[in-house]
């Protein structure tokens, strides 16, 4: 231990304080040699032939510390990932096996479509014609089976003209007579005459005045 002396400026007293040698910043030769021996004794031994870590494979790694040596295990692959990889490999192999049979199946499918294409068109046309006839044709325009012929440009024109005439005939078939029209308007006409007589005390049917608040005078032209 060294001593550090401090002298006061005012009173002139001297204070003595003991401080460790490490704080003084002075290193002797004996302390330097002792520190070197301590450092060399703490260095880990180098790997030799007898070291178990020298012959280990790539899967085992070691972490060296001052006091002991720890082994780092290799990363473990989860089983779910291994199953997924195996499933993809099997699916790819199965797809490669099924590839040669695909062109033959496609040719058979095209042949079946070509054979049944005409029948499907005829069935669809028949259903569409039946549906349109059932939904849009009035009862008065339904023709008998004897009048139906093969469709064509001339037949289409004649059909449109005949259907138009038939519609005009059905609309203008009933014309009321004059007597029926008079009976239809008679009730409304009587109501108007009654309202006129009560308001103006004059009869428009007989063309003569009636007793009331108005006084009527005949004009001689």
Swiss-Prot record:
GO terms for molecular function: cyclin-dependent protein serine/threonine kinase inhibitor activity. Keywords: Protein kinase inhibitor. Residues 27-92 are annotated as: Disordered. The keyword Amino-acid biosynthesis does not apply. It comes from the Eukaryota. Transmembrane segments: none annotated. Residues 63-87 have a biased composition (Basic and acidic residues). Induction: By auxin. Down-regulated by cytokinin. GO terms for biological process: regulation of cell cycle. Pfam families: CDI. Residues 31-42 have a biased composition (Polar residues). The keyword ATP-binding does not apply. GO terms for cellular component: nucleus. InterPro entries: CDI_dom, CDI_dom_sf, KRP. Belongs to the CDI family. ICK/KRP subfamily. PANTHER family: CYCLIN-DEPENDENT KINASE INHIBITOR 4-RELATED. This is Cyclin-dependent kinase inhibitor 5. It comes from Oryza sativa subsp. japonica. The lineage of its organism: Eukaryota, Viridiplantae, Streptophyta, Embryophyta, Tracheophyta.
């Amino acid at each position: 231990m060294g001593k550090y002396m401090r002298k006061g400026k005012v009173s002139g007293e001297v204070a003595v304080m003991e401080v460790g040698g490490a704080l003084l910043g002075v290193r002797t030769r004996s302390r330097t040699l002792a520190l070197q021996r301590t450092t060399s004794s703490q260095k880990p031994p180098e790997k030799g032939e007898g070291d178990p870590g020298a012959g280990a494979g790539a899967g085992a790694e070691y972490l060296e510390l001052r006091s002991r040596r720890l082994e780092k295990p290799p990363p473990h692959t989860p089983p779910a990932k291994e199953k997924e990889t195996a499933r993809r490999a099997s699916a790819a192999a199965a797809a490669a096996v099924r590839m040669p049979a695909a062109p033959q199946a496609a040719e058979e499918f095209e042949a079946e479509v070509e054979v049944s294409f005409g029948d499907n068109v005829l069935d669809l046309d028949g259903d569409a014609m039946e549906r349109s006839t059932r939904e849009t044709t009035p009862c008065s325009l339904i023709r008998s089976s004897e009048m139906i012929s093969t469709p064509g440009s001339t037949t289409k024109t004649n059909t449109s003209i005949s259907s138009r005439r038939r519609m005009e005939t059905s609309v203008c078939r009933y014309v009321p007579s004059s007597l029926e029209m008079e009976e239809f308007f008679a009730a409304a006409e009587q109501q108007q005459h009654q309202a006129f007589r009560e308001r103006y005390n004059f009869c428009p049917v007989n063309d003569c005045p009636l007793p009331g608040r108005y006084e009527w005078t005949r004009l001689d032209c």
